Amino acid sequence: MSDKPLYSRVLLKVSGEALMGPAQYGIDLDTVDRVARDIKQAIDAGVQVCLVIGGGNIFRGLSGAAKGMERASADYMGMLATVMNALAMQTALEAIGVPTRVQSAIPMMTVCEPYIRRRAVRHMEKGRVVIFAAGTGNPFFTTDTAAALRAVEMGCDALLKGTQVDGVYSADPHKVANAERYDRLTYMDVLARDLKVMDASAIALARENAIPIIVYSIDEPGGFAEVLTGAGRCTIISDAA
């Protein structure tokens, strides 16, 4: 393995839950700062980075719908939660000298930029991190699908998903002690085995556009930069297992 990154432009999907840290709700600023430092390592190595952040640490549309809320309204609330997370991450990145722009799929001009694909590409070409907020801007679509969509639109070489575990397992390793860990999978493996990596539409988008999905532990300091060089512990999902 070399220290040179294998990818020139990547999208990092961060779940809202990952930003809770040890808490049960909300944004843990120490965790946000640590993720920001990991991103800076990649930027310093010459990688162009964009992000999609979930909102499950604040509000999850599916949970709201399950409790009787109209699904569309619940999803819009979840999208607004992602904007809060995006602003927190922007603040953390800029505090350590990484120029960052937030673009929202739901226009809110006094808070951040609207999503404009060509502008986002130019930002990354200038070395800025772009954080895509508010998912796709449409209800009934997850932030995983938004991540796959933005990765395709931005021409990313890979989609990285930072989770609480170091790859994809046959079952939740926190609940099933003998769960099998996979180093490599195909897109069809994920769909056929119903592995809980991303939803089917996100997997299909990545597959159709030949974008590998790399699942790694966001809780491991420096893990993001390591995975980009091929040295980190992760699961790679592509056409070739």
Curated annotation (Swiss-Prot):
Family matches, as CDD domains: AAK_UMPK-PyrH-Ec
Ways its activity is controlled: Inhibited by UTP.
Enzymatic class: transferase
Subcellular location: Cytoplasm
Keywords: ATP-binding, Cytoplasm, Kinase, Nucleotide-binding, Pyrimidine biosynthesis, Transferase
Pathway: Pyrimidine metabolism; CTP biosynthesis via de novo pathway; UDP from UMP (UMPK route): step 1/1
Example of a GO cellular component annotation carried by this entry: cytosol
Superkingdom per UniProt: Bacteria
Alphabetical list of SUPFAM superfamilies matching this protein: Carbamate kinase-like
A Pfam family the protein falls into: AA_kinase
Gene Ontology BP term (one): UDP biosynthetic process
A molecular-function term among this protein's GO annotations: UMP kinase activity
Keyword Methyltransferase applies: no
Main location: cytoplasm
Binding site for UMP: G55, D75, T136, G137, N138, P139, F140, F141, T142, T143
Catalytic activity: UMP + ATP = UDP + ADP
Ligand binding (ATP): K13, V14, S15, G16, G56, R60, T163, Q164, Y169, D172
Complex formation: Homohexamer.
Family note: Belongs to the UMP kinase family.
Entry protein name: Uridylate kinase
Organism: Parvibaculum lavamentivorans (strain DS-1 / DSM 13023 / NCIMB 13966)
